[in-house]
UniProtKB/Swiss-Prot annotation:
Domain named BPTI/Kunitz inhibitor: residues: 4-17
The protein's role, per its UniProt record: Serine protease inhibitor that inhibits plasma kallikrein (Ki=1.7 nM), and plasmin (Ki=33.0 nM).
Family from the record: Belongs to the venom Kunitz-type family.
Superkingdom of source: Eukaryota
Transmembrane intervals: none
Record-given protein name: Kunitz-type serine protease inhibitor OMI
Tissues showing expression: Expressed by the venom gland.
Cell location: Secreted
Length: 17
């Protein structure tokens, strides 16, 4: 799951690309 676009970011955003 990518949380880079979801504020707030839980520390280092994990982008599941």
């Amino acid at each position: 799951k990518d949380f880079c676009h979801l504020p707030p970011k839980p520390g280092p955003c994990r982008a599941a690309i």
